[in-house]
A protein has these predicted regions:
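Active-site neighborhoods of divalent-metal-dependent phosphate/nucleic-acid chemistry enzymes
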Residues: 3, 68-113
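Histidine- and aromatic-rich ligand-binding microenvironments
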Residues: 7-8, 39, 94-95, 116
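Alpha-helix capping/helix-boundary segments
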Residues: 11-12, 42, 76, 100-101, ...
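Nucleotide phosphate-binding site architecture
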Residues: 12-13, 47, 121, 129
Length: 131
C-alpha cells in the first residue's frame, strides 16, 4: 500500500495522550489528505506500551485502524542492512527499532513524522518532519 508519510511511535503516543487539542492532533488535521502509515515495529511498540498501561484493547484497535501498517519486505531488509553498516562504520548507530522505522520510510520514499531528531538525523537520506 502506498503511504505519504510514515509515523514514529512518539507521534502515536502523543496523539493518544493529548486527545484532540495537542500538536499531533493539529498536525493530523492539517494533513488530513495524506495516507499515514505506521511501520509494523511502531505498531508493536505502541501495542506493547498500551498493554503494559492496561488500556482498553478495543479502544487501541479503533485508534490504530485509521493508520495502515507498513510491513516488512525484501527491499526493507536490504535497506536496514545497508543503514546498519553505514551507521556502524561512522560509529553513529541508532536503536534497532528506530533503524527499522527509518528503513520503512526510506523504502517508501516518504518522510518520517517524529520528534526524535537526535536519532534519526544520523540516517543518510531520511527526510524528517516534526509535528
Amino acid at each position: 500500500m502506498r503511504v505519504d508519510r510514515v509515523l514514529d511511535t512518539n507521534f502515536l503516543i502523543a496523539r493518544w495522550r493529548e486527545g484532540e487539542g495537542g500538536p499531533a492532533s493539529v498536525w493530523l488535521k492539517a494533513n488530513a489528505n495524506l495516507i499515514l502509515g505506521i511501520p509494523w515495529i511502531v505498531k508493536a511498540e505502541f501495542l506493547r506500551g498500551a498493554e503494559i498501561a492496561g488500556h482498553d484493547r478495543q479502544a487501541i484497535r479503533d485508534f490504530l485502524k485509521r493508520f495502515p501498517t507498513v510491513w516488512l519486505d525484501e527491499d526493507k531488509l536490504e535497506i536496514y542492512a545497508s543503514l546498519y553498516s553505514t551507521l556502524k562504520k561512522r560509529n553513529e548507530l541508532i536503536g534497532p527499532n528506530d533503524l527499522w522505522i527509518a528503513a520503512s520510510a526510506l523504502q517508501n520514499s516518504v518522510p518520517l513524522v517524529s520528534k526524535n531528531k537526535i536519532e534519526f538525523q544520523r540516517v543518510p537520506g531520511l527526510r524528517l518532519e516534526s509535528y
